[in-house]
Amino acid sequence: PNYPGHGLPVTQFIKYDVNDWWACVQEAYQFLKEEGYEVINAAGVSLGGLFTLRLAENVELNRIVVMSAPSEKTEAGIAWRLEKYGKRMNQIMRLSEDESVESLAQIDQYQDEIKVFQGVINDIMSNLHDIKSTARILYGGQDEAAYEESAHYIFNQISSDNKSIQDFPLNQHLMTHGEGRDELEQDIVEFFTQK
């Protein structure tokens, strides 16, 4: 499932923040524990990758897969990504040019939340040494170079004795979509089913 606000126009997206999304992750983990699962794996792309790391810093996970996770983001970089998301959603919704401009202007009201999000990224990165789970760190060869650098940073900082890193040359930022997806999915399935 999407995090609250994700997949919605910017006007609705900005009603939520990183704390709402993190609460969803915690609820999902708690649900699995209450259902009796003792061996829990986690995987995530981008924001989901960050939350996979954060979860592994705070609870015992068997295996983790982290894809396209940033090790740092400037406020301007976060705002740019939100604007890019907003433009894509506005196209999907077929908003007029005026409606799109009005929608994107609301990103300015989200600056406090952007600062909080930046702080969460910094906090996650400063606690990577707490991660002991078996880990697979992945990045797309068609993504921005910063994500390859982030993958190597994360790989080098986690304390896991059993960790690996790999690029998927055909994949873009959202690695689970588009070209290279099938190979990626096979890799993840094999990783999670290893004994």
Indicate residue ranges for each PLM-predicted region:
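Conserved alpha/beta-hydrolase fold motif
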Residues: 39-42, 64
